[in-house]
Amino acid sequence: MSLNFLDFEQPIAELEAKIDSLTAVSRQDEKLDINIDEEVHRLREKSVELTRKIFADLGAWQVAQLARHPKRPYTLDYVRLAFDEFDELAGDRAYADDKAIVGGIARLEGRPVMIIGHQKGRETKEKIRRNFGMPAPEGYRKALRLMEMAERFNMPIITFIDTPGAYPGVGAEERGQSEAIARNLREMSRLNVPVICTVIGEGGSGGALAIGVGDKVNMLQYSTYSVISPEGCASILWKSADKAPLAAEAMGIIAPRLKELKLIDSIIPEPLGGAHRNPEAMAASLKAQLLEDLADLDVLSTDDLKNRRYQRLMSYGYA
C-alpha cells in the first residue's frame, strides 16, 4: 500500500521501494539460492532508523505538510477505531445538512458522549461533497444543535478539529458565517457539560475555533493550529506563497510552541512517521488521552468548568 511519501521523506521512500522490490522477487521465486529475507530485515531496520532521524528534526512547514497528508486519519476514522455504537445526527434544522461537519452520539468505554468534528473526504467526489472540510454556517449551527442536545442529556462533548478554515464563499457569508462562528464561541463557553477538543490535522482559524472552545484542548504531535495558513500569511507579508515555509516557522503553528504559549493542554504523540502510518495505534493513544481528560473534568463542578473555559477563551491573544 502506498504511503504517499512527502518531499522530505524521499530518502525513506527510496529505501521502502528497495524493500518492496526484494519482497516481490522473493515471492515470485521461492527457490532462489540467496537469502533475501536477511537483506529485507536489514533494510527495514535502516528505514526505521532513518525515519527516526528525519522526524526528530522536523520544521514547522514539514509538520504542516504532515497535518495535510492525504492518508491522515479523519474524524470518522477515529470514531470507528476509538468509539462504539456511533449514531450520526444530521442537519441544522434551519437550512441544510453540511457534510463538512459530522456529529452524533457514541460510547467511549461504555459512556455516552457527543462527537462533533470536521470531515474532509478522501476521493474526489467525497471531497467535493464535504467541501474539503470547510464548513458553511449550517455546519456550525448543526454543531451547536448537537452541543445543546448533549447538554440536555448531560453527555460530555468531544470535538475533532481538522479544517483549512470556514468556507469563505459568498453564499456562506450571506447566510451568516461570522455570526454562526461567533455564536458557537459564546455558547460553547457557557455549556454545563465537559468539552474536550483535539486538533487532529489542520486547525485553521475561526473555522477551527468554532468547535474548539473546551475545558481541555489537545493537539496531535504533527497537527497545526493557526489564524491563517502559512501560504496565506506569506501572500500577505511577502506577496508570494513561495515564502510559506518561512511563514510557518514565524507563526508558531506547531504543538510544542502552542503548549509553551498555554493555548493547548496536551500533545498526543503520533506513531513513527505520523498518524497515517498506524491509525490504530494513533486511535489508541487518542482514546487514552480522552479518558484521562474526562476523569480530570468529572471532579469539577459545573461552575468551575464554565469559569475555567471562559477564562481560557478570554486569555487568547495575551502574552
Curated annotation (Swiss-Prot):
The cross-references to InterPro entries, in alphabetical order and at most eight, read: Acetyl_CoA_COase_a_su, ClpP/crotonase-like_dom_sf, COA_CT_C
Tell me where in this chain the CoA carboxyltransferase C-terminal domain is found. 35-296
List, alphabetically, the Gene3D superfamilies matched: 2-enoyl-CoA Hydratase, Chain A, domain 1
Task: Give the enzyme class.
Answer: transferase
One Pfam entry for this protein is ACCA
Q: What is its EC number?
A: 2.1.3.15
Keywords per UniProt:
ATP-binding, Cytoplasm, Fatty acid biosynthesis, Fatty acid metabolism, Lipid biosynthesis, Lipid metabolism, Nucleotide-binding, Transferase
Q: Name one GO cellular component term.
A: acetyl-CoA carboxylase complex
Q: In which pathway does it act?
A: Lipid metabolism; malonyl-CoA biosynthesis; malonyl-CoA from acetyl-CoA: step 1/1
Q: Which residues form the signal peptide?
A: none
Catalysed reactions, semicolon-separated: N(6)-carboxybiotinyl-L-lysyl-[protein] + acetyl-CoA = N(6)-biotinyl-L-lysyl-[protein] + malonyl-CoA
An example of a Gene Ontology BP annotation on this entry? Answer: fatty acid biosynthetic process
**Family recorded in the similarity comment:** Belongs to the AccA family.
Entry function:
Component of the acetyl coenzyme A carboxylase (ACC) complex. First, biotin carboxylase catalyzes the carboxylation of biotin on its carrier protein (BCCP) and then the CO(2) group is transferred by the carboxyltransferase to acetyl-CoA to form malonyl-CoA.
Q: How does it assemble?
A: Acetyl-CoA carboxylase is a heterohexamer composed of biotin carboxyl carrier protein (AccB), biotin carboxylase (AccC) and two subunits each of ACCase subunit alpha (AccA) and ACCase subunit beta (AccD).
- Name the record gives this protein: Acetyl-coenzyme A carboxylase carboxyl transferase subunit alpha
Q: What is the lineage of its organism?
A: Bacteria, Pseudomonadati, Pseudomonadota, Gammaproteobacteria, Enterobacterales
